[in-house]
Amino acid sequence: MLEFMDYVQLAFAEATRWNQDNSYSSLTAIAESLLDFHVPERLQVHLSSLSTPHFATSYTLGTVGLIDGSVSYLFSTVPLNNTPSQSGVIPLRRLVRGYRQIEAPVPPIRNWGWDAIPSHDSSQIIDSADINQDDIVRKATLLHATLHLPPPSTLNALFQRRISPTTQITAALVSTQGPPLIKSAPSAALLAQISHDTGTFSNEYLFSTDNALFGWRGLWNIGLDPSPGKQSTDKVSLLSAGAEAYYSPISSLVGLSTGLKFTTLPAAGRALSSSSSSSPGSNPSPISSFPYTLTLTLTPLTGSLSTTYSARASPNLAFSSRFGFNVYSWESEMVAGCEIWRKSPRTQPAEADDGLDWARRKMGIVKERAAEKISALSSSSSTPQAVEESEGDSVVKIRVDQSWNVRLLWEGRVKSLLVTAGVSLGPGTFTALSSGPASPTSSSAPVAMAGAPPTSRPSYWQGVGVSILYSS
């Protein structure tokens, strides 16, 4: 489950119409949300608040033997008026990162006289004729800082600013206080990033003061309409290709990876429904009846190859699998996982009885009122947007790998509290991939077992924890 500050940052990106999915770093985000979810290992309590449309605060307290916590503040120049902030009304599907239907990227309108973000609703398609009619607000800027306590404390700071419709700059700072007995300046590292997104192409340029690391990430959406402000509503699928490269002149560190992604778009479901209602002699749609995503990533320097397949079998059920292979060490990894959403039955509120049912029965209007209710209910629940964002009360995630390491996570709403509870189980003799070369899929191994020496005693208990979130 996303933390409250991450949820507010996501709302900021939606308010400024910045597509976070159109990036090479999000190439395998869907599979990672189903296979690499984090299981809490202790008791944590989060208290958060969006006190004004521009300002948010969050406090975290955790304990298992050692009490620690954090204090976070966030400021946005863009008002987040339409962002649900109470934990009792926040849609759970926006906090839980699972399988989600990706929309085709919309190329932004390149108005070089642009000096601000228009303040109209982010869900509307931008028209070049409407830009001059919209109210103009200041350039979108976000400031976020988190202080982790107790000492030695760590400070995380984030700065984001849109400088054009297609460009955004980001600066992240991490500073750690030294030991109390050693008088030294706090260590710090700065990461600067320039993101340029034109819809069809997405490029990111990075620089880190840690070892003077330079980096680049790029993504190309093949066959996307490059017309500014025009959304490709007729495309049923999207094929994306990307790559990333890193180099450090100080440590002579070199990194390189490439990837492909194929995903279905919402138009595939509409095309399937229209083809099924047409004549039997029409050609069937080549796209499957359910949304799915395929990815392929390759790291040539380490010889790592990884493939993922994720599918949503129903609005409340999604599956994902990953296979990783290293051509140098001949080691492999297989991971499978799923998520199951559940909605508790709720009785509809009873209508007020005005005592005139007998008159309606005599006049024959009871059936007409029932037909109106049924048609209104079907029209409100049959839209793709309603199905995509249908609220669930809880979700269960399960993940298992080839060595029978199992993670089980439950996330749901209890009254006005958002609760996350999980357990991690697995044999203590698991050593696969811990001594081999690093691979893009090695992050799926349990953190508690990575690099640990093998033991002859089988220990199946790895961790258990609970996290509670309340926001106002």
Swiss-Prot record:
Which spans does this entry mark as compositional bias, Low complexity? 433-450
Q: Which family does it belong to?
A: Belongs to the MDM10 family.
Its name, as the record gives it, is Mitochondrial distribution and morphology protein 10
GO BP of this protein: establishment of mitochondrion localization; mitochondrial genome maintenance; mitochondrial outer membrane translocase complex assembly; mitochondrion-endoplasmic reticulum membrane tethering; phospholipid transport; protein insertion into mitochondrial outer membrane
Q: Known Pfam families for this protein?
A: MDM10
Origin species? Talaromyces stipitatus (strain ATCC 10500 / CBS 375.48 / QM 6759 / NRRL 1006)
Instruction: Keyword check for Transmembrane, yes or no.
Output: yes
Q: What information about domains appears in the record's comments? A: Lacks alpha-helical transmembrane segments, suggesting that it resides in the membrane via beta-sheet conformations similar to those predicted for other outer membrane proteins and porin.
Membrane topology per record: Multi-pass membrane protein
One GO term describing the cellular component: SAM complex
Q: Give the main location.
A: mitochondrion
Q: Which UniProt keywords apply?
A: Membrane, Mitochondrion, Mitochondrion outer membrane, Transmembrane, Transmembrane beta strand
Q: Its function?
A: Component of the ERMES/MDM complex, which serves as a molecular tether to connect the endoplasmic reticulum and mitochondria. Components of this complex are involved in the control of mitochondrial shape and protein biogenesis and may function in phospholipid exchange. mdm10 is involved in the late assembly steps of the general translocase of the mitochondrial outer membrane (TOM complex). Functions in the tom40-specific route of the assembly of outer membrane beta-barrel proteins, including the association of tom40 with the receptor tom22 and small TOM proteins.
Q: Which InterPro entries match?
A: Mdm10 (IPR027539)
In residue numbers, the region (Disordered) covers 433-454
Quaternary organization: Component of the ER-mitochondria encounter structure (ERMES) or MDM complex, composed of mmm1, mdm10, mdm12 and mdm34. Associates with the mitochondrial outer membrane sorting assembly machinery SAM(core) complex.
Tell me where in or outside the cell this protein is found: Mitochondrion outer membrane
